[in-house]
Every structure is written in structure tokens, then in C-alpha cells.
UniProtKB/Swiss-Prot annotation:
It comes from Mycobacterium marinum (strain ATCC BAA-535 / M). ATP binds at residues 10, 58, 86, 92, 104, 114. Its cofactor is Mg(2+). Its EC number is 2.7.4.6. The active site is at residue 117. Homotetramer. The gene is ndk. Keywords: ATP-binding, Cytoplasm, Kinase, Magnesium, Metal-binding, Nucleotide metabolism, Nucleotide-binding, Phosphoprotein, Transferase. This is Nucleoside diphosphate kinase. Disulfide bonds: none annotated. GO terms for molecular function: ATP binding; metal ion binding; nucleoside diphosphate kinase activity. It catalyses: a 2'-deoxyribonucleoside 5'-diphosphate + ATP = a 2'-deoxyribonucleoside 5'-triphosphate + ADP; a ribonucleoside 5'-diphosphate + ATP = a ribonucleoside 5'-triphosphate + ADP. Its main location: cytoplasm. It is found in: Cytoplasm.
Length: 136
């Protein structure tokens, strides 16, 4: 069964010119890029995307970071796309939890600047895709 997930290449990934490497890894995993867009993120979109973190101490810095420079937003499709991309991304903390061979393990430096976002469930994927790609 084909599944869809939202993938974001965050500002640090775009600024460090890792977009091609990350997309290549997604495709080599056997996943397909169904939609791809470079965009500047508004504070409104960022607030909606990260709504579950509102009120947490890091919320303001998270919004500041994600709106600081362009991101690449993509709809990624394939069998078990959500779990497959999360495995490819690696643990959220790129130093302590992401293993070598993952995007974060190979390129990440800090927890906040961890290069990519991938939906964590089918429900999140549906909500996030609707936010980032309303006509999809």
C-alpha cells in the first residue's frame, strides 16, 4: 500500500546545500517525490505546523528558525513512506541518537538544527500535507 508523508528540508539543510543529497537518499530508499517546492515559511504556517509545541519553552526559537530562510517542502510517497523516511532521517538529536548512515547522523550538528522533518504518523502526514500543499 502506498503511503504519503510530508518531508521538510529545513533552513539549515538548504543553506548547507544538502538538498540534492537528501533528495537522492529519499529516492535511493525507493520512495518517490510526488510534489516539491522551495518556499519561504510564514509565521502563520509555522505556528500551524508546530501547533502541538505551542506553549513549550522552545516554541519561539523553533518558529524563528523555520521562518529564517527558505525550506524545501515535499510530498514523498511509497510503501511505508512515513516509517521509511523517519528511519532515513535518523534520531532527532543528531549527535546522541542519530546513527551514522542517516541524514542527521551524517550531517546534523544540533537538535534544533537537525536538517529535516518527516511526519510521525498517518494522521500527522494528512494534516501537514493539507497545510503545506492545500491543493494536493
Amino acid at each position: 500500500m502506498t503511503e504519503r508523508t510530508l518531508v521538510l528540508i529545513k533552513p539549515d539543510g538548504v543553506q548547507r546545500q544538502l538538498v540534492g543529497e537528501i533528495i537522492s537518499r529519499i529516492e535511493r530508499k525507493g520512495l518517490a517525490i510526488a510534489a516539491l517546492e522551495l518556499r519561504n515559511v510564514t509565521e502563520e504556517l509555522a505556528s500551524q505546523h508546530y501547533a502541538e509545541h505551542e506553549g513549550k519553552p522552545f516554541f519561539g526559537s523553533l518558529l524563528e528558525f523555520i521562518t529564517s530562510a527558505p525550506v524545501v517542502a515535499a510530498i514523498v510517497e511509497g510503501p511505508r513512506a512515513i516509517a521509511a523516511f523517519r528511519q532515513l532521517a535518523g534520531g532527532t538529536d543528531p549527535v546522541e541518537k542519530a546513527t551514522p548512515g542517516t541524514i542527521r547522523g551524517d550531517f546534523g550538528l544540533e537538535t534544533q538544527f537537525n536538517l529535516v522533518h518527516g511526519s510521525d504518523s498517518a494522521e500527522s502526514a494528512q494534516r501537514e500535507i493539507a497545510l503545506w500543499f492545500p491543493s494536493a
